[in-house]
Amino acid sequence: MTDIAIVTAVRTPIGSFRGAFAPLSAVDLGAAVVRGLLERCQLPAAAVDELIFGQVLTAGCGQNPARQTALRAGLPVDTPAVTVNLVCGSGLKAVQQAVQAIRCGDAGIVIAGGQESMSNAPYLMHGARDGLRFGHASLQDSMIQDGLWDAFNDYHMGITAENLADAFDISRERQDAFAASSQRKAAAAIAAGRFREEIVPVSVPQGKKPPRVVTDDEQPRPETSEQQLAQLRPAFRPADGSVTAGNASSLNDGAAAVLLMRVDKARELGLPVLARIVSSAVAGVDPSVMGIGPVSACRQALQRAGWTLDEVDLIEANEAFAVQALAVGQLLEWDSEKVNVNGGAIALGHPIGASGCRIIVSLVHEMQRRGASKGLATLCGGGGQGIAMTLQR
């Protein structure tokens, strides 16, 4: 099988909801990260054969946002681009599709990743097509409807998390402890400057004022304690729930991208091989417990790689909810000391279309820093799916 290399891996800072990146669209963020990627590797834009980008919240964004990103980033007009939607796994699915394109010989050099502006998801008015002739009309939040709502059971993703708490007997205390740990790990990573290498600064217009350059993640709350988290009310099941705003991932804006090509092509161009992509898998599960999707996906990806879980040195697993991450860890029985060593989505944020690539970016850089040999990245996805990918240095 053809060895595929990641030669550059970058991301924007992650903005909080209606925060620093509120003036920017998903395409703005995607274009910024693609420009940053090309600058890092000093590769001419014309050398890129295709761009594949994940984005979940595309309502009102215009045709094929990935194509908009490609052209705004300076890729030639004859370079194709496609937008991918696997909900939270979109960014990682984009990477998987890029690998497949290169292995099939359909492309030589591909930029893959994801972008999302949850801050700018529009409201929808159903029924207006035929005219609202009398009475009231209601607006529907496209962020919730298209990104956070289970289409099969007609309830919020938070209820799927509550279902996991019930099924696996995971207490509120364990969830809060996990969330506080994620915040502490992220705070330590930021203080040590461990995200600097992977982040591309983003310039944000401020009208007549000079642009603001955002260089750091906006979401982390380093002062968070378990005692503070215990004071929060359940967000989705008020009477007896355990999932809160503090032990769940947040609403965010951001983008991430990787540059992929064959290992021999990278060496020919004098580009570094940060990691090789070994295998990947997507798996379906019951939508009502979508959070366990990574279990089957990880098992399949590891089997395809010929690895055992014990061989893996580092794991990046998206923290959609603390209870979801705990349930996956419980089922896979992985070593928690290897997982999200610099914090996860509960602390850093979860821009849903970008997170799949964001965890790859963070994993690659931490593998480099530690001299780790084998890595695993995985996410769950709304609608009952999981995706996983194995990397090797």
Give the role of each language-model region.
Residues 109-163:
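Flexible glycine-/small-residue-enriched beta->alpha junction loops
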Residues 1-24, 139, 225-292, 296, ...:
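Condensing-enzyme catalytic core mediating Claisen C-C bond formation in acyl metabolism
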Residues 1-61, 65-73, 80, 160-172, ...:
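Conserved active-site "lid/cap" helical segment
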Residues 55-109, 152-156, 223-250, 331-358, ...:
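Conserved catalytic cysteine-centered active-site region
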Residues 11-12, 23-27, 31, 40, ...:
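N-terminal extracellular/periplasmic Venus flytrap/periplasmic-binding protein-like
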Residues 46-54, 80-85, 110-115, 176-181, ...:
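Beta-strand segments within the central parallel beta-sheet cores of soluble alpha/beta enzyme folds
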Residues 86-116, 159, 165-194, 257-264, ...:
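Active-site-proximal alpha-helical scaffold in enzymes
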Residues 160-162, 198, 206, 278-347:
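Active-site pocket-lining segment
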